[in-house]
Swiss-Prot record:
Gene from which the chain derives: rlmN
Entry protein name: Dual-specificity RNA methyltransferase RlmN
Family statement drawn from the similarity comment of this UniProt entry: Belongs to the radical SAM superfamily. RlmN family.
Stored NCBIfam families: PRK11194.1, rRNA_mod_RlmN
Gene3D superfamilies: 1.10.150.530, Aldolase class I
Lineage: Bacteria, Pseudomonadati, Pseudomonadota, Gammaproteobacteria, Alteromonadales
């Protein structure tokens, strides 16, 4: 039986150089190879013309460059493109390309499904299947870059920003997320600025501390409620890591981070008559008073079977004004791609192999009662 080949998309530069040392080659050869893979999108060793033939043959014998395939895509009227990415065994994740006038952001998944069971998120309703590998994470960027034409003129803006805000909780897959983000930041990888790579978390505090020791990227935190009582319902991981513990972890992270410029991005989904009253806005402002931040208010994007509705524009406006009275920077996020279910909270994935999934959790089965504001 032949030995399984090493997928080079699984290796950050440190691991790539270790491989080349094992091959008896100098470190700069690893850097050359990474440029071919990530700057030019080349997966055939024979096309790497500044690498000698003997080394190309060695690489072909032991290694491969394999990214997950795009199995389908939909394009929104606003230019957003949602990709279904096949990651094997009948499994798919979703990756979303969001073009704007001055940038193009790719929203990347870190897991197949999600275990956190946030009650307003469609991905959470599926349960959790597995973590994505490094190659499956960076492969989303690599494959979509191919779709966009890499350096060629295709009419689409090249990817300038990456947000780990797709399917899954990135901090529950640190072993793969950290080297994947290393590749995103590496000059010989995707060469993105650390301020253009954002990780979003719902608050796995010990893993947030580990991230801070390993990497410096922009941080977005999913708060979604101004107190523990409501957040226990909306974001159940709060029962393990309550708000004050989460906020302390956030402050530790931004204290050692340059990417965040001294403040964190707070994400707050606006749920009609659930978390959007003016009283709750005052409560949120008081909650965040010791944590430098800007606040993204996210209009809820309904999905089939969702027990929640989207806050009205007038309620969002009142909520926003209260926060600004406290001196907070507030942005009301423009909904993108909701006509193709690509908006925030709508990534569900067409996953056919569900044998390892948790049973679906439905709000109506839990008999959760939330006080109407």
């Amino acid at each position: 039986m032949s030995e399984k080949k090493i997928n080079l998309l699984d290796l950050d530069r440190k691991a790539m150089r270790a491989l080349f040392a094992d091959l008896g080659e100098k470190p700069f050869r690893a850097d050359q190879l990474m440029k071919w893979i990530y700057h030019f999108g080349v997966s055939d060793f024979e096309e790497m013309t500044n690498i000698n033939k003997v080394l190309r043959q060695k690489l072909a014998a032991r290694c491969e460059i394999v990214a997950p395939e795009i199995s389908g895509y939909q394009k929104s009227a606003d230019g957003t493109i949602k990709f279904a990415i096949h990651v094997g065994e009948g499994q798919e994740v979703e990756t979303v390309y969001i073009p704007e006038d001055d940038r193009a952001t790719l929203c990347v998944s870190s897991q197949v499904g999600c275990a956190l069971e946030c009650t307003f998120c469609s991905t959470a309703q599926q349960g959790f299947n597995r973590n994505l590998t490094v190659s499956e994470i960076v492969g989303q960027i690599w494959r979509v870059s191919h779709f966009l034409g890499f350096a060629k003129e295709t009419g689409e803006r090249p990817i300038t920003n990456v947000v780990m805000m797709g399917m899954g909780e990135p901090l529950l897959n640190l072993a793969n997320v950290i080297p994947a983000m290393d590749i995103m930041l590496d000059d010989f990888g995707f060469s993105l600025s650390k301020r253009r790579v954002t990780l979003s978390t719902s608050g796995v505090v010990p893993a947030l501390d580990k991230l801070g020791d390993a990497l410096d990227v922009a941080l977005a935190v999913s708060i979604h409620a101004p107190n523990d009582e409501l957040r226990d319902i909306l974001v159940p991981v709060n029962k393990k890591y309550p708000l004050q513990e989460f906020l302390a972890g956030i402050r530790r992270y931004i204290a050692k981070s340059n990417a965040n410029r001294g403040r964190v991005t707070v994400e707050y989904v606006m749920l009609d008559h659930i978390n959007d009253s003016t009283e709750q806005a005052h409560e949120l402002a008081q909650l965040m008073k010791d944590t430098p931040c800007k606040v993204n208010l996210i209009p809820f994007n309904p999905y089939p079977g969702s027990p929640y509705g989207r806050s009205s524009n007038s309620r969002i406006d009142r909520f926003s004004k209260v926060l600004m009275e406290y001196g907070l920077t507030v942005i009301v996020r423009k909904t993108r791609g909701d006509d193709i279910d690509a908006a925030c909270g709508q990534l569900a994935g067409d996953i056919r192999d569900r044998t390892k999934r948790l049973a679906k959790k439905r709000m109506q089965e839990n008999q959760i009662s939330v006080t109407m504001n």
